Each structure stands twice: as C-alpha cells, then as structure tokens.
Amino acid sequence: MTLKLIWDKFYVSIIFVITCLVLGIVLMCTVLGNSNNYSEVNINEGDSLWAIADEYASKSDMPKADFVAWVEKENNLTEGHVKAGDSVVIPVHETKLQNSDSTIQLANQ
C-alpha cells in the first residue's frame, strides 16, 4: 500500500487521531499551566477574610473585595465565615510571600 492509498482509505481516521492528540496536548498544557502554587494561610482566633485581605491583597494585585470574593469561591466558604484552625488558599503565589519579607511576626506573638 502506498501512502496515497492509505490516505484515501483512512483520511477521516487519521485526521481524527491527529485532532485528538493536539487537543490532548493543549488540555494537558492548560491543566499543568494552571497549577498556580497559591499560598495557604492558617486562620487564627479573631481572623476574618477582610483581615486576611488587608494583609495579602496588595501582594495579589487585586482589590480587597475581589480578593475576598476569590477566597470565598475557591475555598467554598459561605458568607465569608472562617474559624480558627481552618486553612484557606489565597490568590498569592508562594514565591511572592517568600520574597516579600523574611521575618513575619504573628499577631498572637
């Protein structure tokens, strides 16, 4: 069989397989590209989402209201209620937290 005969007989299958491969690669790159390595913050007694936004919103380049809305959505929080001992993901890349200030003083210390 020559290539022309193979193409004439199986062109639909060949195009389908190539399309699936391309879409699979695009999907894989998209999924791997969205692993943003966002930071996780532990909630202490008396903390609120707005207090966390006051501290971290400037590092995320978001207004505080958008920051709080993002945290509520991504952490499945209802009405922004958090309790001590919880941890929430915030839209600040880990590298921005590491580069910002090497000495962090906790509120309860």
Swiss-Prot record:
Residue ranges constituting the LysM domain according to the UniProt record: 39-90
InterPro entries: Cell_div_suppressor_YneA, LysM_dom, LysM_dom_sf
Keywords: Cell cycle, Cell division, Cytoplasm, DNA damage, DNA repair, Septation, SOS response
Gene Ontology biological process terms, A to Z: division septum assembly; DNA repair; negative regulation of cell division; SOS response
Keyword Glycoprotein in record: no
Domain of life: Bacteria
Main localisation: cytoplasm
Presence of keyword Transmembrane helix: no
Pfam families referenced in this protein's UniProt entry, alphabetically: LysM
Cell location: Cytoplasm
Gene Ontology CC: one annotated term: cytoplasm
Protein family: Belongs to the YneA family.
Name of the featured protein: Cell division suppressor protein YneA
The encoding gene: yneA
